[in-house]
């Protein structure tokens, strides 16, 4: 299954002390396909470096980029579906183009997608995603 993982959810999943660590372990084990773009990788890098450390950021990004279950997407169109936080659109664009089953997020800005009769991308929390794994 193709998924897009919001940055805050990635940060929660990479901590071995967090209840969502299994999401990261299942990614490493190849149980789902993580869809990314260059913009998403840049955000992952910046936020992990700022919140944890540059060394951890390098380790995590290298781990992501070296996995076979990563699908790199090059969006050719920006849909601009989220107006409340334009920066979140990179995740939506990736999910639409990758035909992802889910965007895994806790960000309420993505809830607008539930009301758009456009190409349906389901929004799911880490807890619900973990239950599916």
Which residues are covered by each model-predicted region?
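A secondary-structure boundary/capping signal
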Residues: 6-7, 36-37, 106, 126
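Active-site neighborhoods of divalent-metal-dependent phosphate/nucleic-acid chemistry enzymes
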Residues: 69-103, 108, 112
């Amino acid at each position: 299954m193709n998924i897009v993982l919001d940055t805050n959810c990635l940060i929660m999943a990479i901590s071995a002390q967090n209840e969502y660590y299994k999401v990261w372990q299942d990614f490493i084990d190849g149980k789902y396909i993580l869809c990314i773009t260059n913009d998403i990788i840049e955000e992952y890098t910046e936020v992990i470096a700022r919140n944890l450390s540059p060394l951890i950021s390098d380790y995590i990004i290298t781990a992501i980029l070296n996995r076979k279950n990563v699908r790199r997407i090059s969006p050719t169109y920006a849909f601009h579906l989220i107006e409340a936080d334009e920066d979140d659109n990179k995740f939506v664009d990736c999910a639409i183009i990758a035909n992802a089953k889910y965007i895994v997020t806790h960000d309420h800005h993505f809830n607008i997608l539930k009301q758009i009769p456009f190409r349906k991308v389901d929004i799911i929390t880490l807890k619900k995603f973990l239950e599916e794994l």
